[in-house]
């Protein structure tokens, strides 16, 4: 599928998964980067380091988990070892801010706005993954109707579509990929005029026990208690959900984030089961890019 074409239409109720199928991408990025821009960007090393990682396997009583206690704003966690299932993400770079513009959590930024290009705040695919070109949308913006295909049924799609319209959705940027083990990932960034607006809508879309509207392939979910809050960067609101057993055609994990004027949805799905560690890693990385 070529860039700019819409995402595959939603499957009938109860069928399919919230993560769209991936089409092979062999091309380079559509957005050129000048040498001057590269010099302005802070390079966040995502391979070869976690900052202050705390292993909590025994404490949580699970096979693999992790937490982060301290982290500089310019640090993004990445691959430390291969033994715990973390993915090898490439070098991650925050785009430069316009001259004089604050970050989304700076004290002088009353609106909580992201002044960098939202499309450049999307997490890149990890090494060896195949990108879903359909999620690029048009000029990097995904049409609202295509984003709404992540929801399970027409009722959910209609309700969320009306909420996004009422709250003045500005843009949707998205990226998706499939890793070699068959795990399919999708990241959606939804931007609004202010952090206050995004915060109010975030509360309407999420709940403690489950999101307000089910994603495709995950009709029954529960709050993911195993996702450590110590991994969340300061100022990031997060609610993670796991599909209840027995799983459908795929095991679906999802996390809703709110940072400043932006709501993010991270979804991973895999036949059989979707591992917790790469999901948590992806959520933390995307949170850091938006912080």
Can you say where each PLM-predicted feature lies in the sequence?
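Intrinsically disordered, low-complexity Pro/Gly-rich regions
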Residues: 1-37
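Extracellularly exposed regions in secreted/surface proteins, prominently low-complexity, repeat-rich
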Residues: 206-291
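Hydrophobic single-pass membrane-targeting/anchoring helices
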Residues: 25, 30-115
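Short loop/turn segments at secondary-structure transitions that flank enzyme active sites
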Residues: 70, 193, 272
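Short glycine/proline-enriched loop/turn "hinge" motifs that connect secondary-structure elements
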Residues: 41, 178-180, 255-259
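Glycine-centered secondary-structure boundary/capping sites
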Residues: 73, 78-80, 163-170, 261
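A small/polar (G/S/T-enriched), proline-flanked helix-loop surface module common
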Residues: 110-244
């Amino acid at each position: 599928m070529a860039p700019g074409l819409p995402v595959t239409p939603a499957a009938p109720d109860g069928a399919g998964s919230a993560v769209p199928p991936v089409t092979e991408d062999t091309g380079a990025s559509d957005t050129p980067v000048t040498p001057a821009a590269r010099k302005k960007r802070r390079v966040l090393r995502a391979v070869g380091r976690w900052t202050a990682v705390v292993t909590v396997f025994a404490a949580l009583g699970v096979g693999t988990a992790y937490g982060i206690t301290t982290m500089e704003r310019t640090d993004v966690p990445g691959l430390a070892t291969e033994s715990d299932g973390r993915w090898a993400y490439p070098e991650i770079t925050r785009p430069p801010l316009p001259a004089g513009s604050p970050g989304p959590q700076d004290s002088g930024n009353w609106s909580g706005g992201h002044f960098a290009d939202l499309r450049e705040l999307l997490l890149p695919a990890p090494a060896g993954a195949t990108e879903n070109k359909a999620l690029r949308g048009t000029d990097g913006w995904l049409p609202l109707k295509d984003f709404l295909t992540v929801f399970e049924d027409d009722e959910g799609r209609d309700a969320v579509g009306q909420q996004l319209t009422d709250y003045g959705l500005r843009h949707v940027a998205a990226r998706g990929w499939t890793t070699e083990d068959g795990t399919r990932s999708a990241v959606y960034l939804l931007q609004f005029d202010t952090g206050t607006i995004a915060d109010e809508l975030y509360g309407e879309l999420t709940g403690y026990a489950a999101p307000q509207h089910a994603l495709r392939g995950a009709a029954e979910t529960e709050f993911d208690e195993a996702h450590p809050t110590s991994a969340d960067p300061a100022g990031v609101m997060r609610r993670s959900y796991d599909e209840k057993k027995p799983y459908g055609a795929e095991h679906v994990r999802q996390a809703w984030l709110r940072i400043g004027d932006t709501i993010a949805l991270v979804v991973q799905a895999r036949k059989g089961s979707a591992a917790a560690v790469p999901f948590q890693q992806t959520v933390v990385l995307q949170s850091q890019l938006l912080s």
